[in-house]
From Swiss-Prot:
Its main location: cytoplasm. It comes from Saccharomyces cerevisiae (strain ATCC 204508 / S288c). This is Proline-rich protein HUA1. Residues 1-86 are annotated as: Disordered. PANTHER family: PROLINE-RICH PROTEIN HUA1. InterPro entries: Hua1-like.
Length: 198
């Protein structure tokens, strides 16, 4: 008996084929406008338009959402936004196909080394002038007892600046089997931009 009730619930093969043919023979429905979905009309059944004259607010609503596709004129590609975390600005007519002027590759999100090599400012190795004097300075041992220097790895955020795009924070660059200090950040692992003094 359970087999008979189970067979009664399922449609036969012929019924399924007829239903598919019936659905295919019907013309496709036009897509519903997005404005109705945004206002929560999806749960209401389709209503006939009223015969009352339209008010000015409904007329402006109907005209504000009209869309006329123009496939004959392709839009120009949008100019990418300048990444505020980059320590440089791109020239006006320059476009990098790898990163789209964001400084980071579109395909994998890693830094675009060609842009970093070309536009990133190099760290200033000698940031403060050194003055040599002939006299000896007195040494105060009490001042240095509590504060020991803090050693950090290259690329540590405590150094400030932006992570170097050439070495990606390691402070070193590789070429085949050779490893050298990064020419952009000089081994710091970060690009530290300082305001220009004039």
């Amino acid at each position: 008996m359970s087999k008979d009730t189970h067979d009664d619930e399922l449609p036969s093969y012929e019924d399924v084929i007829k239903e598919e043919e019936r659905l295919q023979s019907q013309p496709p429905r036009p897509p519903r406008p997005a404005a109705n979905l945004a206002q929560g009309h999806q749960s209401r059944p389709h209503q006939r338009p009223s015969t009352m004259p339209a008010t000015s607010s409904s007329q402006t609503y109907a005209h504000s959402h009209s869309y006329t596709p123009t496939s004959s004129q392709p839009r120009p590609p949008p100019r990418p936004q300048q990444n505020p975390s980059l320590p440089w600005t791109y020239p006006p007519r320059f476009y990098c196909s790898k990163c789209g002027n964001t400084g980071y590759k579109l395909k994998n999100g890693r830094s675009c080394k060609s842009c970093w090599r070309r536009f990133a400012p190099q760290n200033n190795v000698v940031s403060a002038p050194t003055y040599y004097t002939n006299y000896t300075m007195p040494v105060y041992t009490n001042a240095w007892q509590g504060n020991r220097p803090l050693y950090v790895q290259p690329g540590d955020p405590r150094l400030g600046g932006v992570l170097c795009g050439e070495c990606r924070g390691s402070g070193r660059t590789r070429f085949l089997l050779d490893e050298d200090i990064c020419p952009l950040c000089h081994g710091v692992g970060r690009i530290i931009t300082q305001p220009q003094r004039y």
